[in-house]
Amino acid sequence: MTRRIVLILALALALVAPAGIARATTADKPAVLAGWTQPTKASYAAWNAARLDRGPWKEYGFDWSTDDCSASPERPLGFDFTIACRHHDFGYRNYKDLGQFRANKARVDDTFYADMKRVCVRHHIAVRAACYTVAWTYYQAVYLFGSVTAVRQADINRAATLMRDR
């Protein structure tokens, strides 16, 4: 219960005054990280705002490095999952740095899927099913293997077939 309250407070503060949190102690890093890796639109917005203005967060020592979608395409069939992949990399790398990866992997993977579905919903309804299929395939790859490198061309071809059949 206490952990949930801390998480809610950290997320609320990150949305209202990101620079104020950044001036807090780095002992708050796990709470800030948790706030930025939830499968919600608000969490994504807070993380993305910090990603675009990293200066105030420098003292936390977050690892912002990314390989985008690893060896898989960032834009399969034109669906741009680049930022979703970067958000996923951010969660994986930083939870590994904190030694809390195993406890948070499933949520970071769920966040990745939620981010991709938010990309899909912006596409025309005629191709949305294909987008959701690719997103589900990418999600299953990270869920099972920890990387989207497991996505095969055949999976993308299946989604392309769905697009043509609509």
Placement of each model-derived feature along the sequence:
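Bacterial N-terminal signal peptides
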Residues: I8-A17
